[in-house]
A protein has these predicted regions:
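Structural and coupling elements of P-loop NTPases
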Residues: 1-608
Length: 608
């Protein structure tokens, strides 16, 4: 049977090319909201972190109705670090809308998600978005998309994919580049005409592939997936199996069944093959599991998610300020929370270490792990993390390391400094082109060469540069790299930082703290331009004497301290440092707090 009343599509694109904004307009124009309903911008980015950063982290489902056809739309993350979300979501759909910015053109993540969609042989609709940008290069971008498709070995049919020209913010679409649209009708029509209806078998035994997981305090874990065949009913007895665990079958019951209407989950009594459904009642259900009829247990093969490339150590906070600011501080709390994250995030890995206090957490990139750290911090957790490390592989006795494909867009005058930095970081230029008045440079660079480069890059390009990277492949180890050219200013006394102590310390470098900040021995309070660390006493008070020289007691002027975000702190960390994370503060500290013990450890290292 062919389901003409249904289409399942995913929207894929590079970060910030306007996916979530376009979905907003599709919801508005299809009558999902009441006329008098107040709806915030980027309504799909419901998580607080997503709204703050303007990025999508979790793939989300919604649906619209157009000419009697229900279109299920899945908004996916555009950042490479959340690629695991994109890979598994593509299993739920039959076609994809590939969004490309009319000025920026295809970017690294565009290539990655497109490759995954082509591998699954999905139908493609190319959407050139933001055509109303003053710097739009519509004709060139069309050529770049075609080149990319050829590069990815697309079939003739995929090369002939329709192109729609949109402005997500204005809510207009047109099939012609030189003709302005009035609304999104051309886009909806293209979806109905080009994305094929599903061929389904409603009478066959039930089979649902779980592609996403949600959690609710009232009903527990909620599985989300597409019904591959058959019909699902609320309170139905089912079996759960997995393609990778042959012979392990669990029995259970679909207690609640929901369908997605607009942004809401609506309870449903039944759903048929092709529908994307949410269900609760199956404890321990996981991504990649297959829910099927008890009399026909058959697992659906699940897409292999790309391996993590970066790891960090999360450990219990053992600084002198431990337990003062956090709600959850013990190793039991930390372990429970990290393993709970695995239930939702397929591209994360957590391993126990030799001690009960520390855990190895691996992810797809620095941003992937920093989002987890920030989320835990907001939930009231207190812990400390090590510097990010890349995951090496040994192939035939030779060490291999992850290589990233880095694309930078910089003003012409900034290229010299970028080339110099890339040379120092073992980057290799593979492509260079002019894009308007700017230069686009493409490098292959070891992943560890990018650690700490973001802030340096923004300084080099006076804040005008844009850099994006994505995992390329594993290659033989490229040799040693220096992590940082600067040293740290380290407090050698515990207490409260005072103006007099900070005034004397600021001659040695740039400070991170204000007067009145509580510090402890071994805490990093600033950055030194020299390569070695310098111990400073920021708690030193000016002692009273009975002699005063005229004019010598002028008010001391302190420079503004450098305030660092979580990502900047992680970039700054050296191998002998840790970042203490609490709901209130971020403090960088030395692994060994005592200055004498630190000096002895350094001497031992030099000898070795």
């Amino acid at each position: 049977m062919i389901r003409n009343d249904l289409r399942n599509v995913a929207i894929i694109a590079h970060v910030d090319h306007g996916k979530t904004t376009l979905v907003d307009q599709m919801l508005r124009q299809s009558g999902t909201f009441r006329e008098n309903q107040v709806v915030e911008e980027r309504v799909m980015d419901s998580n607080a972190l997503e709204r703050e950063r303007g990025i999508t982290i979790l793939a989300k489902n919604t649906s619209v109705h157009y000419h009697g056809v229900k279109i299920n739309i899945i908004d996916t993350p555009g950042h490479a670090d959340f690629g695991g979300e994109v890979e598994r979501v593509l299993k739920m759909v039959n076609g994809v809308l590939l969004l490309v910015d009319a000025a920026e053109g295809p970017m690294p993540q565009t290539r990655f998600v497109m490759q995954k969609a082509l591998e699954l042989n999905h139908k493609l609709i190319i959407v050139v978005n933001k055509v109303d940008r003053p710097d739009a290069r519509i004709a060139e971008v069309q050529d770049e998309i075609l080149e990319l498709l050829i590069d990815l070995n697309a079939s003739d049919e995929q090369l002939d994919s329709p192109i729609v020209f949109c402005s997500g913010r204005a809510g207009t679409a047109s099939r012609y580049a030189d003709k302005e649209g009035k609304d999104l009708t051309p886009l909806f029509d293209t979806i109905l005409n080009h994305i094929p209806p599903m061929q389904v078998d409603e009478t066959a035994p039930l089979q649902i592939l779980v592609s996403s997981i949600d959690y609710n305090d009232y009903v527990g874990r909620i599985g989300i997936g597409r019904i591959e065949r058959g019909m699902a009913k609320a309170n139905q007895e089912v079996s759960v199996c997995n393609h990778n665990a042959v012979g392990q079958v669990k029995r259970g019951k679909l207690v609640n069944l929901y369908q997605i209407e607009g942004l809401a989950r609506v309870p449903a009594e039944t759903a048929t093959a092709g529908d994307i459904v949410c269900f609760s009642g199956l404890e321990g259900i996981n991504i990649g599991d297959t829910v099927c009829a008890p009399d026909k247990v058959e697992a659906v093969p699940f897409v292999k998610i790309s391996e993590p490339t970066v790891e960090m150590t999360f450990s219990v906070n053992d600084s002198p300020f431990a337990g003062k600011e956090g709600k959850f501080v013990t190793s039991r709390h930390l372990r429970e929370r990290l393993y709970r994250e695995l239930l939702k995030d397929v591209s994360l890995k957590v391993e126990d270490t030799d001690t009960a206090e520390a855990f190895k957490v691996s992810g797809r990139g620095e941003m992937h792990l920093s989002i987890l750290i920030e989320t835990m911090r907001r939930e009231g957790y207190e812990f400390q993390v090590s510097t990010p490390r890349v995951l090496y592989k040994t192939v035939d006795g030779q060490l291999y390391e992850p290589i990233e494909r880095l694309i930078v867009d910089v003003p012409e005058e900034g290229t010299g400094a970028v080339f110099q930095s890339m040379g120092e970081r073992k980057g290799e230029l593979v492509h260079m082109s002019a894009v308007g008045s700017r230069m686009r440079l493409e490098f292959l660079i070891p992943a560890r060469g990018l650690f700490g480069y973001k802030s340096e890059f923004l300084t080099q390009t006076k804040g005008e540069g844009v850099m994006n990277s994505i995992f390329f492949e594993y290659q033989p180890y490229k040799g040693d790299l220096k992590r940082r050219d600067t040293g740290s200013l380290v407090a050698f006394e515990s207490g409260e930082a005072v103006t007099y102590g900070l005034y004397n310390a600021q001659d040695r470098g740039v400070l991170f703290i204000d007067p009145g900040t509580q510090v402890y021995e071994g805490m990093v309070v600033g950055v030194s331009p020299k390569t070695e660390d310098i111990n400073v006493n920021v708690c030193k008070k000016k002692h009273m004497t009975n002699t005063r020289a005229a004019g010598s007691d002028d008010a001391m002027r302190l420079n503004s301290p450098k305030k660092m975000s979580l990502e900047e702190c992680l970039e700054f960390l050296n191998d002998d440092e840790l970042l203490e994370v609490t709901p209130v503060s971020l403090r960088i500290r030395k692994r060994i707090l005592d200055s004498e013990l630190r000096a002895k450890a350094r001497a031992r290292e030099k000898k070795a």
